[in-house]
């Protein structure tokens, strides 16, 4: 990383320093020029002529060449515990369905923080009533039956029970080099993190509970903290979005919350090393990818020394909140977040960027005559269900215009463009930002005016190339069951990042 003319050239992006508010706190924030300036440069896209876009070209390489990576790379897949009775065993329902030979980490989602005494008073209620923080907490499964109670034989291997922990125990022996992590939190289960971390006693109780679980299940290789997010965002603390969402209240001040996050990680790191040996158990944490909204509210430089990796959730970067169509998980979005954290003195080799195995679905208000990305959208999504890669493959197969992809060695590259000249699904690819999208202009279709931002082999290839070139730690996936039935994308990751280590 070099400094030139008051700007930082790092990881292939130019960033500038701005002051921005974080709740009621002013903090230094690194903002990419693509966020700070109006987007005006032409993008060379693969799309129908009517859908050429304009956007900031923010993927230009740094003036300094960076050597190809030398550090081991990681493929981290999240596995959702609620899928056991919602999906077929071999399609994400059971742990056995994970492509174990293509991953290096499996993060089990989720466990949660709860008051140890069983009280149901929320942290928000307790804080607003002027009560002191509780001091006894523990971690519990969000689905005990699926995790360890269900003794029904596995549909894949009837010799073992189908509950997740029984299968993890078996697969940890078969794949000893794969780290199985217990992920605590998640978007809807962050309601007690802040109150727990507010006092030393609360942190001690949480850490002790983690140690007890790791001792009971020795195949668990570490803890992944998915607190979304300490210190909140520029909007302040996150409010619940539904009956099943705890939100993420802040107990105390924004500054205290942020400091307590680092203290919690320090306590966890110390306990892990003392109980299991230095570096034996892993400790990771999830970070937002929003460089202008959420990341400024967390002091990752204070947290980093205690972590093996920081998993940047570089997805959901576009949505109804923008008012226009955009890219939810582009290569540029991943680069922006990585650059931001490197500027905060986070080692690049500790950073994982994210790959979403689902589409962000938006409803355009009308079919544009020109630009598609940046088109006005409705305030609602056209569907509530999660569109996985298998469903997307059907829309792609029906596309009336777009492009094909081929393999060149291990890498995936664009092959041929096509255009049937009719209405229907149209595939587009933003070369400058590394992002795939679909939209439908067939008035007779139930998908009329739909816009889908998604990951394909090309955008994923851009991320894998960036990881190798800039020596990042690797890639995270939300989540393994959303990939194609053949796990095509996870295998693309494993083949290129893990290679002979598989």
Give short role names for the model-derived ranges.
Residues 106, 182, 225, 268, ...:
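Conserved, mostly hydrophobic/aromatic
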Residues 64-214, 241, 245, 326-327, ...:
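Glycan-recognition patch characteristic of GH18 chitinases/ENGases
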